[in-house]
Amino acid sequence: MQSADCIGLFRSLSVPNHVRPTKSKKLIFAYERNPKIMSQRNINLKLPHSWNECSTEQLELISRIMLEQIQRADRYHPFDMRNVKIACFFIFAGIEIVEGIDESKPLEEQHYTCRLTTPSRRNRIFSCKQQEEETFPIYLWQLNHWLTPKPKTDDRNSAEYLASGAGLLDWLDNERGAHLTRFPYPTLRLRNKRGLLRRKTDYEGPAQDMDGFSWQQYRFASDLMGQYTSLANNLVKMKQMGKFTPEQIAQQADSVDQARSMFLATIFNRRIDFIDTNTNVKVHDFHYDTRQFDTQAPIFRHFPDHQWQPILFWWTGMMHTLSRRYPHVFKVQKLDRTQRPSTPLEIYTATIATMQKYAGLTEDQVNNQSYSLVLEHLERLSKENEEMENIRKK
């Protein structure tokens, strides 16, 4: 990233006043190491250490940065996660770039002139002398050290170890690290786009670990996410090929949006009347309705991209968690090219049949069963079948 582009990126991303990271991480600035540069001054910067430590506003900021970088990418300037990390570092730390890099200086002396962002616009009005006193440099070599990934080896003499850094934002793209498992939108209020009154409706998002999800709600959400992913990937390919008309692109984009809205309508519950199975009493509260993926989908059409991305982060994190919790259920099977892959309906039907046979449950009972209990039962059956197969092979 060129210095001019870098400054433009940081200045174009405004930081909400209420966004503040959650954990302190003291960083040593160059002028602390060399008192000749400036008088010694300690500055404690706060950066989140994981996805789950990010507030909803911070997750949306990450999404906006990623979406902007994706839009700016082209054949000669591919998407680079390092640019995302640089922007996130300055925004999370509450640092504003006052002056860019002077490329005429030696590389080790090139730096950004920065200052800490103030909580209100009124406090930003200072005299030139005050501005000069509160500015500080961040050198390129410092930024490179802070954002270069940590080593994956303990060999201190290896090239990887010698080239490693502090890796302060490794969690942004570290597949082996902690994933987002906290749903970013516990509650959501949306306006009904249909009808004359256009009333707002309150929705409740998934609880921790999707507690309360039935097997049917989980399967619907999983299948709709698979459908969305397939349609979205096809849309990207269609745009890259350049052989489709604008009408065809628009039609595919509408299909993607429809699949996304149906997924959101499935995981967000609204207040409805239902019979509490524990008390057998009629209750009006947030509850799952088997038809909500269809009836509520129009309300979730054209859902903002910067809010959709955190939900994608969460779903990815949940699937990673479940795959580790139930490894046999989520085990990747080798594909047989002679056989056609199973459809979601076939998988759903096979699961119902298995539960009916081995657990003695009806289809409705399986659908209303907690998704985690069904996965536990399937995990146990899959493990037993694998052990039996290993015995037969011996």
Language model features with spans:
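An amphipathic, hydrophobic-aromatic interaction surface with interspersed Lys/Arg
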Residues: 3-394
